[in-house]
Design a protein with these regions (language model features):
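Beta1-alpha1 glycine-rich phosphate/pyrophosphate-binding loop at the start
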Residues: 5-32, 61-73, 82-84, 111, ...
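FAD-site-proximal beta/loop scaffold in flavoenzymes
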Residues: 252-285, 368-449
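A structured beta-alpha segment of the ubiquitous adenosine-cofactor-binding alpha/beta core
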Residues: 35, 207-228, 276-280, 343-389
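Glycine-rich dinucleotide-binding loop and its adjacent helix/turn
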Residues: 125-142, 203-220, 243-307, 414-429
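Ferredoxin-type iron-sulfur electron-transfer modules in oxidoreductases and energy-metabolism complexes
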Residues: 23-41, 63-95, 112-141, 267-270
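Local cysteine-cluster metal-coordination motifs and their immediate loop/turn environment
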Residues: 44-63, 88-111
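A conserved FAD-binding loop/helix module that cradles the flavin
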Residues: 300, 445-471
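Short hydrophobic core segments
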Residues: 151, 231-239, 289-291, 389-396
């Protein structure tokens, strides 16, 4: 790159952010975009480390220093081509990845100078290239005559479809929802990811040759057996939608909401999607408590304030430092008026026929658990009741295996996750192959609830396993 001391002379600059009082009026993305000049300047801050920790920390192992260099040289189409070699959804990951604990958190410049704005540049690459007419080059791809059914149009399914299509295998993607994306569309609010971004990705993939069959639920609208009969292989990428309960009294009271149905209902309302059985949950003028400290909890907090809730409180059982979600999202929630109660363990949702409050106990952090995080320990005599009209439970998600899995020898573990090893075993000859040799799986329904980018990675890896299975 041009100037060896660019990282000193040019400070880290993030895209402009809409002021809190303005962004609360809608569900639009809150971050702006780099113009060409600023993108080049920020990309040129990269040190091009010999051992790039950013690349290692990225779950898909993006060629980050290489495409930063291309952006700095204004070679945007080449940067787009390179970013798509490792990531099927770079414009989406650039928006929703927690870069502060992945690539940017591993940047050599993070301490003292400010990490390179990797996520914002990643978003800039695809947004700009698409706007200028760039599309993935499949001119040298030869059709193999093979076709694969993919169940689930979320990150894992899209990642799988991308790799298969680039290898000459016809990918047909089934999804029960009216639009692709899975939780990208229906779970992640528009202020983090505008739905037009996902809609554009659908157009790009359809131009590549991917076929989408939406509003189609396998096992209900189409029997799974027909997929086994008509396709050379099947990939399962249905994600995790079942919420994890807290196990305390009062969870069944009216006014207690699961995080995901709440977020989905809001997206359906904003986008005017008509989904059978869905009803809009409006928090206007209500006192809302959100339980949890991850990104989904922040999505619920920030959605409720946009619905004009009277007050939104986020209660978390550990301290702020131990919150599992993105620090950026916590900061955004605070700016938007969300109150935080740290070291509060919920023990009961109280009320007579409806939610009236949340009983919590203050905690202190004790010895580390098996994951190295210090356990919350209740402080004796510290119970209190926080008044509330609604409680949103955002403790995470787990897979809910389809009832027909056992009929087709698709094994799951004790947590309901499909058993599909990431490497060859005695029972699985190919990557991400299930106990049914013709069926592969990846993403959250294999690893449990995780990041968008890890689901993309596993979908892509599963596609490689399918290609080996098909001898393509």
């Amino acid at each position: 790159m041009g100037n060896n001391f660019q990282f000193i002379e040019v400070k880290r600059v993030d895209p402009a952010k809409v002021k809190a009082e303005s962004r609360l009026k809608n569900f639009d993305e809150i971050y702006g975009k780099f113009d060409t000049s600023l993108a080049k300047e920020q990309a040129d801050r990269c040190l091009a480390c010999g051992n790039p920790y950013c690349e290692w920390k990225c779950p898909v192992h993006n060629y980050i220093p290489d495409w930063l260099k291309l952006v700095a040289e204004d070679r945007i189409f080449e940067a787009a081509e390179l970013s798509h070699k490792t990531n099927s959804l770079p414009e989406i990951c650039g928006r929703v990845c927690p870069q502060d604990r992945l690539c940017e958190g591993s940047c050599t410049l993070e301490d003292g100078f400010g990490a390179v704005t990797i996520g914002s540049v990643e978003k800039y690459i695809s947004d700009t290239a698409f706007a200028q007419g760039w599309r993935p080059d499949l001119s040298k791809v030869e059709a193999t005559g093979k076709k694969v059914a993919i169940i689930g149009a979320g990150p894992a399914g899209l990642g799988c479809a991308d790799v298969l299509t680039r290898s000459g295998v016809q990918a047909i993607v089934f999804d029960k929802y009216p639009e692709i994306g899975g939780l990208l569309t229906f779970g992640i609010p528009g202020f983090k990811l505008e739905k037009s971004v996902v809609e554009n990705r659908r157009k790009v993939m359809e131009e590549m040759g991917v076929e989408f069959k939406l509003n189609t639920e396998i096992g209900k609208d189409i029997p799974f057996q027909s997929l086994l009969d008509e396709y050379d292989a099947v990939f399962l990428g249905m994600g995790t939608y079942k919420y994890m309960k807290g196990g305390f009294p009062g969870e069944d009271l009216p006014g207690v909401h699961e995080a995901l149905p709440y977020l989905i209902s809001n997206t359906n309302e904003v986008m005017n999607y008509k989904i059978e059985g869905d009803s809009y949950v409006d928090m206007k003028d209500q006192r809302v408590i959100v339980l949890g400290g991850g990104d989904t909890a922040m999505d619920c907090n920030r959605t409720a304030v946009r619905q004009n809730a009277e007050k939104v409180i986020c209660a978390y059982r550990r301290d702020e430092e131990n919150m599992p979600g993105s620090k950026r999202e916590v900061a955004n929630a605070k700016e938007e008026g969300v109150e935080f109660l740290f070291n509060r363990q919920p023990i009961e949702i109280v009320g007579n026929g409806k939610v009236e409050g949340l009983k919590v106990v203050t905690t202190e952090l004790g010895e580390p658990d098996e994951k190295g995080r210090r356990r919350p320990v209740a402080v004796e005599g510290s119970e209190e009741v926080i008044p509330a009209d609604a409680v949103i439970v955002a403790f995470g998600f787990q897979p809910s295996p389809s009832s027909w899995f056992s009929d087709f020898n698709i094994n799951v573990d004790d947590w309901g996750r499909v058993v599909a090893p990431e490497s060859k075993t005695e029972t699985s000859q190919f990557m991400y192959q299930s106990s049914n040799p013709k069926v592969f799986a990846g993403g959250d329904m294999v690893r449990g609830s995780d990041l968008v980018v890890t689901a993309v990675y596993e979908g892509r890896q599963a596609a490689e396993g399918i290609l080996d299975y098909l001898e393509v």
